[in-house]
Amino acid sequence: MAKISRRDLVISLSAAAAGAFLLPKTVTASGLEKIVKKGRLKQSVSWWCYQRNFKLPEFARIVADMGLTAIDLLQPNECEVIKEFGLICSMGYAEAAKIPDGLNNKANHDAIVKGLEKGIPLAEKMRVPNLIAFFGNRRGMSDTEALDNCVTGLNRIKKMAEDHGVNICVELLNSKVDHKDYQGDRSDFGLQVVKAVASPRVKLLFDIYHVQIMEGDIIRTIRNNHQYIGHYHTGGVPGRHELDDTQELNWATVCRAIADTDFKGYVAHEFVPTRDPIKSLSEAVALCDV
């Protein structure tokens, strides 16, 4: 199966945000049983993983029928589409949020800050709790310089985030498989940045798939640092596919560990299904409903 990344799909499909694909005949929203029963964790799902399969309104209805309350990684116009289904966007994009061109380089700060200055009030208005940000690629930069630059950039915008009650979540990504040269590829680096910024509205987007590839030790890291984490992503390792018995992690145990920290944010599924997409998502939601 050809490898698909979030970046590839966002680029190739952004012109058709609402989608242009037909819902498979075997899937009907009215026939879905509510899956979320316990609800200790608020679960969401990343839209980019399903853009090849569904129109956004149809997918939103399916997600709502499952018992989820949000969809992840939407553009502002897409946030409006899902409102009628009682859903919010759990993680939004701000302008100039680019994986390689991140906060580690001061040359990017003006564009990033401008995008967040526009995006934060809009996020508050649309009830989007989080906006994504990135550390950026190294390009030869030392971690010490990058850390200082990231803190400087986030300090410019943290007050606005605090005033509007919107979280800026900077994502940890792996540099071993998917994002070569990415600077924020270790939890220690990201934690140093967030601790130095010292704002309740600047957190990590802790992508469990990426952290597992780079360092493992998922549960202990979460338990010791949960106060610095604003959002979680799931994805099976290896391959970023279903959360099943082909994967390295015991996802129910991981999710129980998250719930035990009294986490109030979202755990968003960000895996690319290889089988029936709704069946795969349903199984993941049930597994993580701890």
What are these regions (language model features)?
Residues 2-64, 127-129, 184-206, 210-290:
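Histidine-acidic metal/acid-base catalytic patches
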Residues 75-85, 99-100:
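Glycine-rich, proline-tolerant flexible connector loops at the mouths of alpha/beta enzymes
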Residues 59-78:
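Catalytic domains of carbohydrate-active enzymes, especially glycoside hydrolases
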Residues 44-54, 100-111:
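Active-site mouth loops of central-metabolism enzymes
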Residues 8, 13-22, 35, 101-203, ...:
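Active-site acidic/histidine proton-transfer and metal-coordination neighborhood
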Residues 49-51, 75-77, 95-97, 137-139, ...:
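Active-site-proximal loop/turn and secondary-structure-junction residues that shape catalytic pockets
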